[in-house]
A protein has these predicted regions:
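Cys/His-clustered metal-coordination modules, chiefly Zn-binding fingers
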Residues: 179-271
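Domain-scale terminal segments
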Residues: 1-196
């Protein structure tokens, strides 16, 4: 069992998942983050590991490692997720669902790539100058200067920039338990559709992530964007794959995780 803390964003309110169990703290770059985080941790003394999900930027990594040092407990574990707002919100909710299913925190940390692959994120933006990605090239900047043009981005196992419109095969992968988590300008939603064909998942439950994206995340830098994350709300298959997968290694040092980790001696956190 573990608890999930979202640093700088809300959890996606998927009705069938325990999103209400996710605690929301300020973004790590905000001046009051350390005080708010320490107040929460000290007011809820527990032996249960806490996973602090953040946007994976250098600032967030530094502040969360500082928090872990000040608090002095190895059970406070930062989890960097290099995804935009819908991906962060969805990941926090999925982690809370896996905790409810009894998945061990060590297995969750070592199986994080599989968890990120559980959701599919697509986005369009009219501007790429705010994107902190090595994949952004000169041609993407030139395209974003054309009136009415958008740059498409897809988040799978890797980040793809300038991808074509979604094909029918992608929509065919959406199952009956899927939900859509979205953010940004809904007027751009049609730009994610297949050529000449609207996206076929209009009947799926749709959840809006309220509030702005973290300003230091290095994503859109503009209001003229739209992002959509599609995930399956039934996590039982995912939990089974994580529990039996070959990727059980400590994210801190790469040691194989069995009952403990020699790097951080986190026996309670990794069983």
């Amino acid at each position: 069992m573990f608890r999930v803390i979202a640093c700088g964003f809300p959890a996606a309110a998927v009705p069938s998942l325990p999103y209400g169990a996710v605690v929301e703290l300020p973004h790590p770059s905000e001046p009051g983050f350390l005080d708010a985080a320490l107040d929460h941790l000290l007011s809820e003394e527990s032996d249960v590991p806490r996973l602090l999900v953040h946007d994976g930027t250098r600032v967030s990594e530094h502040r969360l490692r500082l928090l872990r040092s000040v608090y002095g407990d190895f059970r406070v574990l930062p989890v960097g997720v290099r995804r935009p707002l819908t991906g962060l919100a969805s990941t926090a909710t999925v982690l809370a669902g896996l905790a409810e299913l009894g998945v061990a925190p060590g297995a969750v940390l070592s199986g994080l790539p599989l968890i990120l692959g559980h959701s599919r994120i697509e986005a369009v933006s009219r501007r790429v100058s705010g994107l902190d990605l090595p994949e952004i090239g000169l041609r993407h900047h030139l395209v974003s200067m054309i009136p009415g043009a958008v740059v498409r981005i897809r988040f799978t196992e890797r980040i793809e920039v300038g991808v074509p419109r979604s094909g029918h095969h992608a929509d065919a992968l959406i199952g009956p338990d899927a939900v859509v988590v979205r953010a940004g300008n809904p007027a751009l939603a049609g730009r994610l559709a297949s050529r000449g064909q609207p996206v076929s998942n209009g009947q799926l439950p749709t959840i809006d992530v309220e509030g702005p994206a973290p300003v230091t995340s290095g994503w859109w830098g503009t209001r003229n964007y739209y992002e959509r994350c599609v995930l399956t709300s039934d996590l039982r298959v995912l939990a089974s794959r994580i529990g039996t997968g070959p990727w059980r290694r400590c994210p801190e040092c790469g040691e194989p995780v069995t009952s403990h980790c020699r790097f951080c001696s986190a026996q309670e956190a990794f069983v």
